[in-house]
């Protein structure tokens, strides 16, 4: 309105530049500013006091909220302060739960409790990276009753290492050399939740992690109801788990938040927000 754009273009000798098409941006602003309803999502993490720690996830919820014409109110909950005695109070009133990425042992028992709460109470659940691994551990402990099931990142002596380093990683002493980084392919199981979310049989997503789903436990987990529905075609590594009998329960080893934009909200966040909205309207 003030004409600053014209002045800038003239100064840069770009006055003949084509006017940008702002229709998509304006549509986003309209839907973001005028939501039809509000939902509450619990973000379970151990760095919640540092708001920028989960900036990409928070931005992804803005994108997905606008796409669903709903305001997403994210409630940050420190996983270190969650236990069996207070979890119902801590997570009361939420319409969905996200367990955030992270490294190290601190706060993981609270994350595992949050997974259990979402699973047992039929709350929409999205586990990202470590959040996917916590879902596997929770299922192994509480459904398969594998006492002490854990990741070798947290307990190298666990009797049931359902999350572990791959064999070829174990001899590498430089930690940076064991990281799985960048874009990796993933084949999706037909008729799974994620197959419907992506509307595709093959995707490519970005990774930043070290430990993996231990395939030695895959048969037990799948027979008990936790399905591996996303597999890397070259390595056979499990990238996605879900519970088909749950309204919406998905854990992904990768980071969908890295690819979400205003113009292209990530379909996983869009679908999760839609599931949380459905939960808010039907419960």
Question: What does each model-found stretch correspond to?
Answer:
Residues 1-202, 207-245, 253-283:
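N-terminal beta1-alpha1 cap of cysteine-dependent amidohydrolase-like domains
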């Amino acid at each position: 309105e003030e004409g600053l754009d014209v002045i800038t273009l003239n100064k840069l000798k770009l006055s003949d530049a084509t006017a940008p098409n702002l229709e998509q941006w304006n549509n986003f602003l309209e839907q973001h500013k005028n939501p039809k309803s509000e939902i509450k999502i619990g973000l379970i993490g151990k760095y919640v006091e540092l708001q920028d720690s989960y900036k990409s996830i928070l931005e992804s919820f803005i994108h997905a909220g606008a796409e669903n014409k709903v305001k997403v109110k994210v409630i940050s909950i420190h996983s270190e302060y969650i236990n069996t005695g207070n979890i119902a109070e801590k997570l009361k009133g939420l319409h969905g739960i996200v367990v955030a990425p992270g490294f190290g042992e601190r706060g993981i028992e609270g994350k595992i409790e949050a997974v259990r709460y979402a699973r047992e109470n039929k709350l929409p659940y999205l586990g990202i990276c470590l959040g996917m691994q916590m879902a596997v551990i929770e299922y192994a402990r509480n459904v398969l009753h594998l006492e002490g099931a854990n990741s070798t990142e947290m307990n190298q002596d666990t009797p049931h290492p359902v999350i572990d380093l791959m064999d070829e990683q174990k001899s590498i002493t430089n930690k940076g050399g064991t990281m799985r980084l960048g874009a990796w392919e993933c084949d999706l199981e037909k008729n799974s939740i994620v197959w419907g979310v992506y509307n595709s049989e093959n995707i490519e997503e970005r990774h930043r992690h070290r430990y993996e789903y231990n395939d030695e436990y895959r048969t037990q987990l799948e027979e008990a109801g936790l399905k591996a529905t996303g597999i890397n075609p070259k390595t056979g590594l499990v990238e996605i788990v879900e519970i088909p009998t749950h309204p919406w329960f998905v854990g992904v080893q990768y980071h969908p938040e890295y690819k979400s934009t205003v113009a292209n909200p990530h379909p996983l966040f869009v679908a999760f927000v839609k599931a949380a909205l459905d939960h808010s309207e039907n419960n």
